[in-house]
């Protein structure tokens, strides 16, 4: 039995899309952070950056600076989110501690939660509009990237071949975590303790 997949897809080249009049672009995350920090410094009367850093669409607040200035963590976070939402490339700017009550669609909220690890990822997640890269690029750029929730990145191959696998395909949504559950169903054994997927029924029906 052979199972093959990929960890991500790839975005269409934004310059090519723009040539065909399809909205696309690049987001200056560091610039957005700098602008937000300038406004936060004025609002709270502090010297230094209340947003400490950004990585992979997450913004990290400076807890030490907030505590040193006796500021409210929640007030600073809310103000940072308000400033970041002013960015024209912002589709959603989310407080990860309270994402369960956000106004994001359920499927997108679930994916954002899957990317969140308290203490390691940032407190604020910035989600750009579709086909917006997370950096600026020139008119001669011909590459691509990934790390988006959109179908061009999230739609990836998943192939089962060999023992007990018949010919077929499915348009039913599946996830990488479904692989373990499906293999266990083929073997008629218990799923692993940490398995959170479900068996891919169309594949089992082809056996």
Model-inferred region functions:
Residues 137-143:
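Conserved alpha/beta core surface patches that mediate binding of polyanionic ligands
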Residues 109, 142, 197:
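Conserved glycosyltransferase catalytic-site signature
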């Amino acid at each position: 039995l052979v199972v093959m997949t990929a960890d991500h897809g790839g975005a269409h080249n934004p310059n090519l899309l723009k040539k065909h009049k399809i909205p696309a672009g690049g987001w200056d995350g560091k610039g957005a952070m700098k602008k937000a920090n300038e406004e936060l410094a004025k609002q709270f009367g502090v010297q230094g950056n209340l947003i400490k850093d950004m990585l992979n669409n997450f913004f990290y607040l400076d807890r030490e600076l907030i505590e040193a200035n006796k500021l409210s963590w929640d007030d600073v976070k809310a103000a940072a989110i308000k400033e970041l939402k002013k960015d024209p490339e912002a589709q959603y700017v989310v407080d990860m501690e309270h994402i369960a009550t956000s106004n994001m669609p359920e499927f997108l909220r679930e994916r954002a939660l899957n990317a969140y690890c308290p203490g390691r990822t940032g407190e604020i997640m910035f989600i750009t509009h579709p086909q917006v890269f997370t950096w600026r690029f020139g008119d001669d750029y011909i590459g691509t990237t990934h790390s988006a929730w959109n179908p061009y990145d999230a739609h990836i191959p998943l192939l089962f071949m060999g023992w007990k696998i018949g010919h077929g395909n499915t348009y039913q949504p599946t996830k990488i975590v479904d692989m373990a559950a499906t293999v266990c169903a083929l073997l008629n054994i218990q799923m692993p303790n940490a398995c959170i997927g479900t068996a891919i029924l169309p594949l089992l029906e082809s056996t």
